[in-house]
Regions:
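Alpha-helix boundary recognition
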Residues: 24-25, 72-73, 114, 134
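Charged, gly/pro-rich active-site loop segments
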Residues: 1-14, 90-157
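A solvent-exposed, acidic/Ser-Thr-rich amphipathic alpha-helical stretch
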Residues: 55, 88-89
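Short, basic/aromatic recognition patches
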Residues: 3-31
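Short, solvent-exposed aromatic-acidic interface loops
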Residues: 61-66, 113
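Residue-level preference for beta-strand/loop junctions
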Residues: 26, 40-42, 89, 135-137
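Short beta-strand segments
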Residues: 28-63, 71, 77-81
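Short His-centered aromatic/hydrophobic patch
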Residues: 85
Length: 157
């Protein structure tokens, strides 16, 4: 169970834990915040896979990406998944990241992400990503969230 906080108690209501999980399961883009060695923030939109049973968030990325370099200094990240269309709602939070380099494990996670986002592992983008994983060029970031801060302006006060 992850602690759920109301992000804007003055205006909107919070999503329940179940609503937050459903929302995270059905979205495709997450904004990932890391901090570089100079202490400067970096926010990147990424595709992700959310496992609602474990509350883990998985993100494929190149092993030499700025995200991975930043995580070598600081394993704590922030994230935001939101709907830019009214009624606005979303989930943001903070968590600790583990970096997975195991090809078989990474392929399994990537296939789940690709089936959800592209509908097929035969899609050209799917084939490219899975090929990069097989070459060992891609890693999987696993976020263990500490909390969710949620908002739902569709249920405004």
């Amino acid at each position: 169970m992850v602690r759920v906080i109301n992000a804007d108690p003055e205006m909107g209501t919070s999503l329940t834990e179940g609503e937050a999980k459903e929302f995270m399961t059905n979205r495709t883009i997450l904004h990932l915040g890391t901090v570089d060695s100079k202490g400067e923030p970096s926010v990147t939109p990424v595709g992700y896979y959310f496992d609602s049973d474990s509350n883990k968030i998985y993100i494929p990325t190149h092993k030499n990406s700025k995200k991975v370099r930043n995580l070598s200094n600081n394993k704590i990240v922030s994230f935001c998944i939101d709907d830019p269309n009214p009624p606005y709602k979303g989930v943001r939070g903070k968590g600790e990241v583990s970096i997975h380099e195991e090809i078989d494990y990474n392929r399994l996670i990537a296939e789940k992400l690709l089936m959800r986002s592209l509908g097929s592992i035969e899609h050209p983008t799917s084939k490219w990503l899975l090929g990069e994983i097989e070459k060992g060029n891609e890693v999987i970031l696993e976020i263990s969230p500490r909390y969710y801060s949620t908002w739902n302006y569709g249920k405004a006060k």
